[in-house]
UniProtKB/Swiss-Prot annotation:
Disulfide bonds: none annotated. This is Small ribosomal subunit protein uS11c. The lineage of its organism: Eukaryota, Viridiplantae, Streptophyta, Embryophyta, Tracheophyta. Belongs to the universal ribosomal protein uS11 family. InterPro entries: Ribosomal_uS11, Ribosomal_uS11_bac-type, Ribosomal_uS11_CS, Ribosomal_uS11_sf. GO terms for biological process: translation. Its main location: plastid. One of its GO terms (cellular component) is chloroplast. GO terms for molecular function: rRNA binding; structural constituent of ribosome. It comes from Phaseolus angularis. It is found in: Plastid, Chloroplast. Part of the 30S ribosomal subunit. Keywords: Chloroplast, Plastid, Ribonucleoprotein, Ribosomal protein, RNA-binding, rRNA-binding. Residues 1-22 are annotated as: Disordered.
Amino acid sequence: MAKSIPKTGSRKNVRIGSRNQTRKIPKGIIHVQASFNNTIVTITDVRGRVISWSSAGTCGFKGTRRGTPFAAQTAAGNAIRTVSDQGMQRAEIMIKGPGLGRDAALRAIRRSGILLNFIRDVTPMPHNGCRSPKKRRV
């Protein structure tokens, strides 16, 4: 059986909007998730739509080096560089996790020149929920 040829104006062939829209974003939210193994920095607008993100792994760090403060600093600087070109001037910071990259990422964000409204720690804390895993014996 012969394959059907799609129409030129069909919905599947037409791209509705360009993916990399450069829109002006004056204010945003910077989410820093710092685990012991990696640090992920996500920048969203105030409605929660992701504008830019970066992690220590995407910046070229592999293995245990991803959990270092320097890797977190590099990831934060990499994510902020793209949004500062789009005109972001003010931001709120949400920091989550116990990792080493918390302070280093915050230091890199402060140095970038973006004005910070507030810094909030949103690390989830259990109110005696699930039993925690047993301690490692090395």
